[in-house]
A protein has these predicted regions:
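Structural motif
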Residues: 43-45, 136, 172
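Pocket-forming structural segment of enzyme catalytic cores
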Residues: 87-159
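N-terminal beta1-alpha1 cap of cysteine-dependent amidohydrolase-like domains
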Residues: 1-58, 63-67, 118-129, 181-185, ...
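Conserved beta-strand segments of alpha/beta enzyme cores
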Residues: 25-27, 133, 151, 169
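C-terminal and late-domain segments of enzyme folds
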Residues: 10, 106, 139-201
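Beta-strand-turn-beta hairpins that frame and shape the catalytic cleft
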Residues: 1-2, 129-132, 164-169
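Cysteine-nucleophile active-site neighborhood
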Residues: 48-117
């Protein structure tokens, strides 16, 4: 399995380190030539969403990334990555940027995360939401979902902070900043399922 990490700006190194810990091959996408490499999934890290969007356009990556996601490439967006999935128009969510303001610019909280049928062994059986430490840094949140295809995976204080729509996973928090690998494992399972279905097809 090879996972592409968008490395234009932001916290991409932490994602790479997390995936390496899980034994996954990773490569950085900094230009169109990088993007053309074979890949089984994409991670869009946190950072500055306006800057990332501008760079995607300037480097000729905006449309290829959008088309790949629309074609079924598994993608995981964190923080600014969540905003970018909304900007790309691939994920049917309405996002509020920098929702927590400066006073709560950075904080951690434990809240339930719904891993569903992909619940790790540490979660209760039958599958149920598992407590997960979530780290937020000037985070957005999802104000509302715009399609029945979007499944809410986690909420904090009534605000949606994680969701999935088919091949797209998005979190307002930064799982790569904690030692817990479960959210990344969840995403890798999405990639494996896609690889399996493609092979069978």
């Amino acid at each position: 399995m090879r996972i592409a990490v968008l490395a234009l700006q932001g916290a991409f190194i932490e994602h790479e380190q997390m995936l390496s810990r899980l034994g996954v091959e990773v490569f950085e996408v900094r230009q169109l030539a990088d993007w053309l490499q074979p890949k089984d999934g994409l991670i869009i890290p946190g950072g500055e969403s306006t800057t990332m969007t501008k760079l995607l356009y300037e480097l000729g990556l905006f449309d290829p990334v959008k088309q790949a996601i629309e074609a079924g490439l598994p993608v995981f967006g964190t923080c600014a990555g969540l905003i970018l999935l909304s900007t790309l128009g691939t994920m049917a969510v309405e996002v509020v940027r920098n929702a927590y303001g400066r006073q709560l610019g950075s904080f951690s909280v434990e809240a339930p995360f719904d891993f569903g049928s992909q619940s790790p062994a540490s979660c209760p059986l039958p599958p149920a939401p598992c407590p997960l430490l979530m780290t937020f840094i000037r985070a957005p949140y999802i104000r509302r979902v715009l399609s029945e295809d979007v499944k809410v995976l986690a909420e904090v204080d009534g605000r949606i902070v994680a969701a999935r729509q088919g091949n797209q996973l998005a979190t307002a928090f930064h799982p790569e900043l904690n030692d817990d690998t479960r959210v990344h494992e969840y995403f890798l399972d999405m990639c494996r399922n896609k690889m399996s279905s493609t092979t069978k097809g």
